[in-house]
Amino acid sequence: MSKNKPQKSLNTGKIQIIHGMHAVRAALLNTKRAHLELHITENNHEFAKNYKSAIKKITILDQKEFKKLYGGEKSTQGIVLKTNDFERPSLQQFVKNENVNDKSVLLALDQITDPQNIGSIMRSCALFNCKGIILAKDNAPDLTPSLYKAASGAAEIVNYFRVTNLKRSISELKKYGYWAYGFDSSEDSKSSNINFTKKSILVFGSEGKGMRDLVKKECDEIIQINMHQNKHYQIDSLNVSNAATIALYEFFKS
C-alpha cells in the first residue's frame, strides 16, 4: 500500500467513482469490473487488506488529505473506489435472453429522478429478486456515487435499463408475456389484494404527480396499497421507495 498523495479523479467515460463501505465492497466483489485505485483513510486499513487481490493500487490518506479530495468521511465512510464500469444489458437483450417460463418482475419508474430513492428501490430489488429497473433516459439519473451508496451494493446485480420511451417499453414487454400493474392512490384504483402473473411489471410514478396518463393507460391494472391514512396530520401517502418495497414483497410471496 502506498501513502503517496493521489491526484483527484472524476467520473469520465466508463470510469466510475464509488464510495461507502457496502457499495465499494460489492464493486470489489464484481469480477466484471477492472478496478484502478482504492483511496482510504488510515482507520480503514483492515477493510482494504481484505480486498488486496482485487485492486491494483491502494492509497492511504490522512484525514486532511481525504477531506480535501472528497469532503470528509460522513458520506464516503473514508472509502472511495475508482473503477471501470462493466457492460450492462439493454432491456431488449435482457428480454430476449430470458427463459419464457421463469418467474420475473421488473419495476418501471415514471419521472422518478432522485438518486436516493432509486438507490433505495434498487436495494429492495436485490432483496426480492427483481430483475431490473426501467426508466426513461431523458430524466433518469446516471449511476452516480450517491446512487451507488444508497443502493448499498445492489447496483452491481440489479439491471438499470434507461430507455428512450417508457410507455413503448412497457408495451413491448407485454408482447413477451408481461402484465403491467400501475400503483396509484386514486379513487378508481383496486385494492392491493391481487394475483400477480408470472411475469409482472410494477409501475410507479413520482410522489407529487404520480404516473403520467400515457403510462397509466398502458397498465393492465391500477392498484392501490391498503393503508391507514392519518387525515388530521395529512399523512396519507408512502415514499415511493417504501411503496415499491411493499409491492415487491407481495410479488415475492405470491
List each model region and its residues.
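Short, glycine/polar-rich helix-capping loops at beta-to-alpha or helix-loop-helix junctions
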Residues: 47, 140-146, 209-218
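Short acidic-hydrophobic, aromatic-tinged amphipathic segments that line or gate anion-handling sites
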Residues: 59-64, 158-167, 223
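RNA substrate-binding interface of SAM-dependent RNA methyltransferases
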Residues: 92, 96-187
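N-terminal positively charged helical leader segments and presequences
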Residues: 1-99
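Active-site/ligand-binding-proximal alpha/beta "capping" segment
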Residues: 181-237
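Short, acidic/turn-prone active-site loops that include or flank metal/cofactor-
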Residues: 43, 63-66, 138-140, 207-209, ...
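Structured adenosyl-cofactor binding patch, chiefly the S-adenosyl-L-methionine
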Residues: 25, 30, 126-127, 148-152, ...
